[in-house]
Amino acid sequence: LLTWKLWKENRKNNGSLTYISFENAPLSKKDIERVYKKFKKLDGYSRFLLKNIPERYKSTHRIFIKADNINLILIYDDITSLINFNFKADTWFLDGFSPKKNPLVWTDKLFKQLYNFTNLDGSLSTFSVAGHVRRGLLKAGFKVSKVNGYGNKKEITYAIKKDSIISRI
């Protein structure tokens, strides 16, 4: 919802936004509604999404938000299905859970796929600051750093894809 709000506030002329979300265990409509109630300032956005949220079955679902030229793509499958798609991302928001809780997300193979699916100067962020996550992102080719977090999170991991001789090999 915040991405949508920021897009709407900062959109240039006829710009378009494609937001792709991989959801291995999508929340029920009831649970989403309960979460959204805590964010009153985003009420208009949440009402639209709740009205249009797809059923929870494994598939690729699309919601077009015509007024703001946003194509929301909800992939109800785990992130390892990324290999079946063809796109380049400017930004990734990764699972913030501990690698022990969601090991599928934190593999060298997936880090390399994320790198290959990221535009030059594209970024990635996650609440996970585990050493093997940072090392895996580095090994994949990202420039990685720990940056100040917010709320109860002291630090987060931030990575960016920069051009280098290694990335062109």
Segments the model singles out, each with a brief description of its role:
Residues L104-D121:
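A short glycine-rich, Lys/Arg-flanked "PGG" loop and its adjoining helix->strand segment in the class I
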Residues V129-A140:
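Short alpha-helix
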Residues L1-I53:
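SAM cofactor-binding core of SAM-dependent methyltransferases
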Residues I79-T80, D90-V105:
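A short SAM/SAH-binding and catalytic strip from SAM-dependent methyltransferases
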Residues F22-N24, W106, V129:
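Short beta->alpha hinge that forms the Motif I/post-I loop of the SAM-binding pocket
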Residues E33-N86:
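S-adenosyl-L-methionine
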Residues T91-L94, T118-S128:
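Conserved beta-strand signature within the Rossmann-like core of class I S-adenosyl-L-methionine
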Residues A140-I169:
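Core SAM-dependent methyltransferase catalytic element
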